[in-house]
Amino acid sequence: MAEGKIFLKENRDRIEKKYREQMMGLPQVFAEIDKKLAECTDEVALACKYLYAFMPYSDIGNYAFEVFLDYAENGVYLWKENSGVAELPEEIFLNYVLFHRVNEEEIAPCRTFFRREIGERTEGMSFREAALEVNYWCAQEATYHCTDDRTLSALAVYRRGNGRCGEESVFTVNALRSVGVPARQVYAPKWSHCDDNHAWVEIWCDGSWYFLGACEPEEILNKGWFTNASSRAMMVHSRVFDTMIPEGEVIGKDGMVTMLNELKRYALTKEITVSVKDSHGKPAEGAEVSFEVLNYSEYAPIAELKTDSLGKVSLTTGLGSIHISARMYADGEWLHAENSMDTKTEDCCEICLMPVGKEKGIFYEEWTEIDMIAPHDAPVNKDMPTPEQKERGSRRLAEANAYREQKVRNLSNPECRKFLEKETGDSSMRKKLLEVLTEKDRTDCISQVLEEHLKFALPYEKSMDADIFVPYVLNPRVDDEVLQKYRKAILEQLSEEEKNMLQKEPAKIWKWIEDKIISSPEKERSSVITTPSGCLKTGTGSLLSKKILFVAMARTLGIPARLNPHDRSMEYMKNGKFIPVSAETEKNASIFLKASEDTQWKYFQNWSIAKLEAGKYSTLKLETENFRDQMMKLPLEAGNYRILTSNRLPNGNIFAAEYYFEVQIGEMKRVELAFRNANLEDMLENISIPEFTLRKEDGSTVKASELTADGKHILAFLEEEKEPTEHILNEMMEQEEAFSRYAKRIIFVVKSKKALETPTLSRALGKLGNVQILYDDFSEIINILGRRMYVDPDKLPLIIVTNKSLNGIYATSGYNVGTGDMLLRLL
């Protein structure tokens, strides 16, 4: 209990000051908020003021006061009723218990509900004990599922029963904060050793931060499947919305959000320094420097800082390759520079800013090869559960999984049924509206929101074909914004004269928006979108939010509109074609690409194109474009571009190549893509894999250390009668003579003897000879081995090649053409 203590005594004056500053920016909105604060207790009002003082403008525009009231009331309740919470340093309580936002998720009131669900399970526990217990509760309510980029609210993850790692961690952080455990989400923004990223959770107890995998409970802290992976990261970061930073190395700001470097808790690190010179060779003060890793065949930022008065900037990072780009506006133009360095052997580098272009400074139309080396596996967190803890954890996780599977068995969104079943005579269009939404949208959409969009779109149904009307007029979704009502609000903002004028000249919608809606990037988080109705409510919105408002206004007026899927430029339909709102985004040039036949080209897997804009390269979104007969023609805006190609090797390293070019208005540039092949020795790893046991046919067990003790072996965990497994078995049978020589070194692992009766596996065993057959239930081992070898354990077959006892040199999972040839090369 917090008897005798004054709530937020140390920060009260600061909160009041920051709240008043926020008020001054949006006085018309805060007048209503102040009325509602007057109805709250002093403690709850102060908690609300803290939330409003440090939330992005988008939150103020998107959500009602009552949403934040839940977070404030629960925070005050915990402070009053939980002595551990009351004793927390105020900056820890404010940022990591009270605050409503975790990252870029939708916000929905959830804290009081979660506390009532979890409270009895954690009563009387320390923060450490409560964190472990809450994670078991999270596992029983949600699990991993690959979804689109829109981040669900914590409550939606709970109701849906699954989410991607960023959503699982948002859910887990909210659950932990709901019972007073200080918690935050941390991110490896991009891995260096594979094309992906990952988010997990840190909790604060005993004066330090500890980590856990969201919805992936363990019996101890500082353990997760990503322990080894995080030791190969070049960056792990957290974020804080407050302007008073509790601790840590600042690695950049995203509007009002400060990014903090947490890598030292996970990996071996060192400090590197970059010196930036201007075009005259003098120190470039205030230059923006982006530290990047090559991931999904594009340079992805992991930290963004500005140089000091000496033109220098420093960063603590991992031991591997990092790409550095810098930009600065000077003498009426943007200057740019790039370089790469291997931090394992280099401590510093120097780059010189120059204009970009054929007639200016930086320019070269030739392929340049670059090797990007991933940090080696060197985990700094080595705690392991005891055998007893491991057994208890397995049992509890099985119970959580069983509970969740029962919960989601017949799960559906009642709001969808409510919308579909309303008897109004437009049932076919109701169905089409739901169909145009994403699968994720259908799990958390609200009937009233859909009703509003249907009502105001239907008058335009007969004026165009359904394949235009449904996706580009009726469709309530534009990008990754929160789905809300906005059509009535938009129409109320416009006079009849304005409606008629904008329908005749849709491009003027953007002028209307520019006149009415301002951008305040220092008060926003770039990835948190202000909804169309939120923009109108506050009169503010980021550039992307305003683009979404353009599409929303056009659709409300019956004009088919979209954001171009390649570059998010605004477009509306005229004479059956989408045309750009801005002449600057007109596709007035093109590129003709020729690809080699021996490489399967896939965008964001082994190639990408980026356009230079304001001194910074932005990657085009071309996932839907494919080569035909090894050729592709793409419309482009005139300007400077960079093509990247990459060959990700099994050991995590990348053989990359860059090609810079400029294309003029009306020009078609011809480029032949270059792909770098690797030698066998470049592809191999030396990874120690943990001991495990497999079953023989008679029920006895054999240790993996014994199986792999003598020379090279192939361990293949097979999923019989599934195409990826069938494919590798067929490849092996096509070269049966070669594989038969190594039959005694090949180990097939299946779930049961019944698998041996399936046609393809049975035929393969007959052709290949004395292949060893062992058994496992696939419940744990494949997950551990897949993660350890840095391949996807959810994709079978899982194939590992060892060269000595418990030492993996190569692994692959899922469907991969040519695996048979690779295995023979390795043997």
Each language-model region and where it sits:
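A short, amphipathic beta-strand motif
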Residues: 270-281, 589-599
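Hydrophobic/aromatic-rich core segments of domains that either
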Residues: 2, 116-136, 145-155, 160-253, ...
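Secondary-structure boundary elements
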Residues: 3-160, 388-538, 548
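Short, acidic Ser/Thr/Gly-rich low-complexity loop/linker segments typical of extracellular
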Residues: 295-317, 335, 614-631
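Short, internal strand/loop/helix patches
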Residues: 762-796
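Short active-site neighborhood of thiol/selenol oxidoreductases, capturing the structured segment around
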Residues: 704-729, 745-749
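Short Pro-Gly-centered beta-turn/loop motif in secreted/extracellular proteins
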Residues: 309-325, 329-332, 340-341, 625-651, ...
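Structured interaction patches on ligand/partner-binding surfaces of diverse proteins
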Residues: 331-356, 649-676
